[in-house]
């Protein structure tokens, strides 16, 4: 089998295609969550704690001089990224929990009892007749 054919077989397997779709959707979902956090959630939180803009939160490690720029530790952007991560992780948890619940329900569906064979039916009839006699 040629190299190209092996690659096609590998790429067209269900797991690889599912993974690719998941990565694309995950990237898009990450952008949506980042926009939600940056534009919707963090401004009211900043307002509640005294009009703080989280993008500008930083510790200045060294002040700016004429020769060099200031050196600062920008922890506000880090806090926003943590909020992004928590929302994405929680969303993934909820989706996986729902999928597992659906999977369990389909596995728990009661199966019809097996139809007894002719021999089992005959043995049952013999047993019933013996009970009546004895």
Curated annotation (Swiss-Prot):
Gene3D superfamilies: Large-conductance mechanosensitive channel, MscL, domain 1 (1.10.1200.120). GO terms for molecular function: mechanosensitive monoatomic ion channel activity. Signal peptide: none annotated. Keywords: Cell inner membrane, Cell membrane, Ion channel, Ion transport, Membrane, Transmembrane, Transmembrane helix, Transport. It is found in: Cell inner membrane. Pfam families: MscL. The chain crosses the membrane at residues 10-30, 76-96. InterPro entries: Mechanosensitive_channel_CS (IPR019823), MS_channel (IPR001185), MSC/AndL (IPR037673), MscL_channel (IPR036019). It is a multi-pass membrane protein. Homopentamer. Channel that opens in response to stretch forces in the membrane lipid bilayer. May participate in the regulation of osmotic pressure changes within the cell. Belongs to the MscL family. PANTHER family: LARGE-CONDUCTANCE MECHANOSENSITIVE CHANNEL, MECHANOSENSITIVE CHANNEL MSCL. This is Large-conductance mechanosensitive channel. It comes from Prosthecochloris aestuarii (strain DSM 271 / SK 413).
């Amino acid at each position: 089998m040629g190299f190209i054919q092996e690659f096609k077989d590998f790429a067209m397997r269900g797991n690889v295609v599912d993974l690719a779709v998941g990565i694309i959707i995950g990237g898009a979902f990450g952008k949506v969550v980042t926009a939600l956090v940056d534009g919707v959630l963090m401004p009211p939180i900043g307002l509640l704690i005294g009009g703080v803009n989280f993008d500008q939160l930083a510790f200045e490690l060294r002040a700016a001089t004429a020769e060099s720029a200031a050196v600062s530790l920008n922890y506000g952007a880090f806090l926003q990224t943590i909020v992004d991560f928590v929302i994405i992780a929680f969303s993934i948890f909820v989706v996986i929990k729902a999928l597992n619940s659906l999977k369990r329900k389909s596995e728990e569906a009661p199966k019809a009892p097996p139809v007894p064979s002719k021999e089992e039916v005959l043995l049952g009839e013999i047993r019933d007749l013996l009970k009546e006699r004895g």
